[in-house]
């Protein structure tokens, strides 16, 4: 620690302004007024202060680097001038370190010098035949200072603080001798920035922090599976596939009729439940394969088909079916007057199997008479019950086959016919 640092630290701690304020209040004088004069450039300014008390001006020493020190110097000069009179010599001439402010000054000095707070340690001293006394030791800046023995602990701490201040001031005797004065606050040289010793700085290497956001799935890239079991087949679109559940299909009148393969299917597996199909008048009649189906498997339940007058009559295969299997229950078919009469195969059926129950057929006057095969049937099997047929007057007479039947089998009972 240099002498200039010590002198500047101690001079800034003194409270000459406070003592001058107390003096003005004691003698009912106006409050001291301070004026500051700034000299030099802005980067290296010098301050000088002047205090006015009771109309008298007191100038400080020149060359201070701050205003506070300049004002303290002006207050000290004022107190020195006032101490020359005999009345004020007692209260003014007493040094600052002789008063109780030395502890405060020492603490301010430690703060300005970046020292630790002064630590006071008091000890009790006992001597035979004398009053008990106390001694105190203060530590500041790593140096311990011990004061004189006193009767109380408070006085012992003040004595230790005064000892420390006097020791610090003793280092600045040379500076005080140069000015040949007893002033405490003196200007000092400004501190120069010394070349700092390069220190090895340990720079910590920053570690890369992991990203906290979730990784997005990379689209368009496929990973190759090591095991064939791990392969995941994505679902394929089903736009081109047929729906398993059959839907109701509404057909237009231009659709073609059922294929003949439907007849083969029913002929092979017997009765098959089929859906009711409403057809338009332009559709063709059922295929001839339906007759073969009934001839092979006997009675088959079929759906009722409503046909228009333009449809053709049943195929000749129906006669073969009845001739082979005997009585067959058939559906009632309502025909229009334009339909042709029953085929000649019906006569062969009755001739082969005898009496056969047939449905009553109402015909119009334009129908042709029964075929000649009816006569052959009666000639072969004798009396045969036939249905009553109402004919119109325009119908032709019985065929020549009726005569042949009576000649072969004798008298035959026939139903009365109305001509």
Swiss-Prot record:
<feature type="short sequence motif" description="Bipartite nuclear localization">
    <location>
        <begin position="207"/>
        <end position="222"/>
    </location>
</feature>
<dbReference type="GO" id="GO:0035279">
    <property type="term" value="P:miRNA-mediated gene silencing by mRNA destabilization"/>
</dbReference>
<dbReference type="GO" id="GO:0003725">
    <property type="term" value="F:double-stranded RNA binding"/>
</dbReference>
<dbReference type="InterPro" id="IPR014720">
    <property type="entry name" value="dsRBD_dom"/>
</dbReference>
<feature type="repeat" description="6">
    <location>
        <begin position="387"/>
        <end position="414"/>
    </location>
</feature>
<dbReference type="GO" id="GO:0009737">
    <property type="term" value="P:response to abscisic acid"/>
</dbReference>
<feature type="repeat" description="4">
    <location>
        <begin position="331"/>
        <end position="358"/>
    </location>
</feature>
<dbReference type="GO" id="GO:0009735">
    <property type="term" value="P:response to cytokinin"/>
</dbReference>
<keyword id="KW-0943">RNA-mediated gene silencing</keyword>
<feature type="repeat" description="2">
    <location>
        <begin position="275"/>
        <end position="302"/>
    </location>
</feature>
<feature type="domain" description="DRBM 2">
    <location>
        <begin position="101"/>
        <end position="170"/>
    </location>
</feature>
<dbReference type="GO" id="GO:0031054">
    <property type="term" value="P:pre-miRNA processing"/>
</dbReference>
<feature type="region of interest" description="6 X 28 AA repeats of E-K-I-E-T-T-P-N-L-E-[PS]-[PS]-S-C-M-[NS]-G-L-K-E-A-A-F-G-S-V-E-T">
    <location>
        <begin position="247"/>
        <end position="414"/>
    </location>
</feature>
<feature type="repeat" description="3">
    <location>
        <begin position="303"/>
        <end position="330"/>
    </location>
</feature>
<keyword id="KW-0694">RNA-binding</keyword>
<keyword id="KW-0539">Nucleus</keyword>
<dbReference type="GO" id="GO:0010589">
    <property type="term" value="P:leaf proximal/distal pattern formation"/>
</dbReference>
<dbReference type="GO" id="GO:0010267">
    <property type="term" value="P:ta-siRNA processing"/>
</dbReference>
<protein>
    <recommendedName>
        <fullName>Double-stranded RNA-binding protein 1</fullName>
    </recommendedName>
</protein>
<dbReference type="InterPro" id="IPR044451">
    <property type="entry name" value="AtDRB-like_DSRM_2"/>
</dbReference>
<comment type="subunit">
    <text>Homodimer. Heterodimer with DRB2, DRB4 or DRB5. Interacts with SE and DCL1. Interacts with RCF3, RS40 and RS41.</text>
</comment>
<feature type="domain" description="DRBM 1">
    <location>
        <begin position="15"/>
        <end position="84"/>
    </location>
</feature>
<feature type="repeat" description="5">
    <location>
        <begin position="359"/>
        <end position="386"/>
    </location>
</feature>
<feature type="repeat" description="1">
    <location>
        <begin position="247"/>
        <end position="274"/>
    </location>
</feature>
<dbReference type="GO" id="GO:0009733">
    <property type="term" value="P:response to auxin"/>
</dbReference>
<dbReference type="GO" id="GO:0016607">
    <property type="term" value="C:nuclear speck"/>
</dbReference>
<dbReference type="GO" id="GO:0035196">
    <property type="term" value="P:miRNA processing"/>
</dbReference>
<dbReference type="GO" id="GO:0042802">
    <property type="term" value="F:identical protein binding"/>
</dbReference>
<dbReference type="Pfam" id="PF00035">
    <property type="entry name" value="dsrm"/>
</dbReference>
<dbReference type="GO" id="GO:0010305">
    <property type="term" value="P:leaf vascular tissue pattern formation"/>
</dbReference>
<dbReference type="GO" id="GO:0035198">
    <property type="term" value="F:miRNA binding"/>
</dbReference>
<dbReference type="InterPro" id="IPR044450">
    <property type="entry name" value="AtDRB-like_DSRM_1"/>
</dbReference>
<keyword id="KW-0677">Repeat</keyword>
<comment type="function">
    <text>Double-stranded RNA-binding protein involved in RNA-mediated post-transcriptional gene silencing (PTGS). Functions in the microRNAs (miRNAs) biogenesis by assisting DICER-LIKE 1 (DCL1) in the accurate processing from primary miRNAs (pri-miRNAs) to miRNAs in the nucleus. Forms a complex with SERRATE (SE) and DCL1 to promote accurate processing of pri-miRNAs by DCL1. Binds and assist DCL1 for accurate processing of precursor miRNAs (pre-miRNA).</text>
</comment>
<dbReference type="GO" id="GO:0005634">
    <property type="term" value="C:nucleus"/>
</dbReference>
<dbReference type="GO" id="GO:0010445">
    <property type="term" value="C:nuclear dicing body"/>
</dbReference>
């Amino acid at each position: 620690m240099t002498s200039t640092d010590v002198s500047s630290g101690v001079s800034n701690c003194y409270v000459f302004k406070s003592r001058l304020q107390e003096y003005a209040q004691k003698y009912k004088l106006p409050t001291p007024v301070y004026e500051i004069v700034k000299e030099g450039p802005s980067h290296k300014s010098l301050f000088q202060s002047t205090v006015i008390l009771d109309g008298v001006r007191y100038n400080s020493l020149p060359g201070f680097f701050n205003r506070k020190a300049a004002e303290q110097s002006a207050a000290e000069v004022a107190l020195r001038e006032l101490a020359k009179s005999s009345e004020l010599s007692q209260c003014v001439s007493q040094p600052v370190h002789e008063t109780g402010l030395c502890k405060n000054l020492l603490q301010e000095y430690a703060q300005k010098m970046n020292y630790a707070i002064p630590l006071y340690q008091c000890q009790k001293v006992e001597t035979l035949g004398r009053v008990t006394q106390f001694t105190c030791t203060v530590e500041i800046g790593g140096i311990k200072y011990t004061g004189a023995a006193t009767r109380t602990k408070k006085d012992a701490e003040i004595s230790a603080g005064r000892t420390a201040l006097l020791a610090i001031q003793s280092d600045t005797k040379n500076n005080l001798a140069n000015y040949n004065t007893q002033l405490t606050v003196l200007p000092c040289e400004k501190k120069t920035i010394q070349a700092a010793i390069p220190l090895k700085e340990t720079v910590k290497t920053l570690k890369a922090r992991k990203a906290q956001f979730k990784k997005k799935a990379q689209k368009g890239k496929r990973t190759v599976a090591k095991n064939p079991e791990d392969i995941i087949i994505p679902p394929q679109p089903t736009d081109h596939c047929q729906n398993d559940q059959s839907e109701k299909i509404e057909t237009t009148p231009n659709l073609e009729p059922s294929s003949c393969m439907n007849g083969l299917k029913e002929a092979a597996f017997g009765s098959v439940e089929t859906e009711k199909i409403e057809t338009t008048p332009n559709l063709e009649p059922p295929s001839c394969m339906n007759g073969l189906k009934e001839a092979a498997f006997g009675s088959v339940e079929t759906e009722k088909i409503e046909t228009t007058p333009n449809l053709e009559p049943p195929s000749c295969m129906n006669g073969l079916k009845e001739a082979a299997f005997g009585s067959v229950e058939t559906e009632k078919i309502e025909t229009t007057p334009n339909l042709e009469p029953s085929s000649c195969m019906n006569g062969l059926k009755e001739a082969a199997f005898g009496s056969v129950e047939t449905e009553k057929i109402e015909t119009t006057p334009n129908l042709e008479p029964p075929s000649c095969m009816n006569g052959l049937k009666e000639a072969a099997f004798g009396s045969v019950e036939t249905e009553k047929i109402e004919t119109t007057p325009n119908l032709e007479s019985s065929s020549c086959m009726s005569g042949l039947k009576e000649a072969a089998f004798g008298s035959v009972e026939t139903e009365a016919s109305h001509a």
